[in-house]
Swiss-Prot record:
Family: Belongs to the ABC transporter superfamily. Lipoprotein translocase (TC 3.A.1.125) family.
Signal peptide region: none
Name of the protein in its database record: Lipoprotein-releasing system ATP-binding protein LolD
GO terms, biological process: lipoprotein localization to outer membrane; protein localization to outer membrane
Bilayer disposition of the protein: Peripheral membrane protein
Top-level EC class: translocase
EC number: 7.6.2.-
Listed SUPFAM superfamilies: P-loop containing nucleoside triphosphate hydrolases
GTP-binding is among the record's keywords: no
Residues given in the record as ATP binding sites: 59-66
Native organism: Ralstonia nicotianae (strain ATCC BAA-1114 / GMI1000) (Ralstonia solanacearum)
Amino acid sequence: MSEAVMTANETTHRAEWGDTAVLQAQGLVKAFRQGGLNVDVLRGVDIRIGVGEKVAIVGASGSGKSTLLHVLGGLDVPTSGRVSLLGKPFTAMSERERNTLRNRALGFVYQFHHLLPEFTALDNVAMPLRIRGENEAQARHTAQAMLARVGLGERTAHRPGELSGGERQRVAIARALVGSPACVLADEPTGNLDDHTAGEVFDLMLELTRTLGTSFVIVTHDIDLAGRCDRILRLRDGHLHQER
């Protein structure tokens, strides 16, 4: 897509949200009870994600990267601290309100695609739109267009078991982006792929989020892939440290 279209999309998002952070966390603490002891995984994490920004979070295994992503996405609640999504008090909302805002404003991609095996690629991608209440014809039309954008326009009737690993992850990316979310949270999205396929999938994610003006937070062990983002943050000892 052209630079002009990219700029138009980011301008649209900026007009909608202004200078408000798409996603912001302040003082996040997350503690778990383990072996009779409290283990603090997050110890006062602050993070701000701007419109269209691409941020990588790196760190050792077990450092709490996935936990942080789950808290940012409203899939887990912090022990203390708060998260704002599009300027709204995400953590203070009721579960129903959180679910509604999450479905509208966030997309998720995981290491394992979590596609529904009994549904076709088209039905998997259309699912978030159906949950949002869009009519069936429009949901399928939008899903078809998004699958075409990820290079799977001829594979829409295939079920996940009939697709390669890279193709399944492309379907997962299409599902994450089909509702034009403000931000995509990705947890090791290329961790289950070979190096060549991982590079292709990561490039696709970056290109789509650029052209759609979508913000992007990725947890990854791959420093080379992280280096393609605008910023790299390292989670160490429960705190985020900016590396670049």
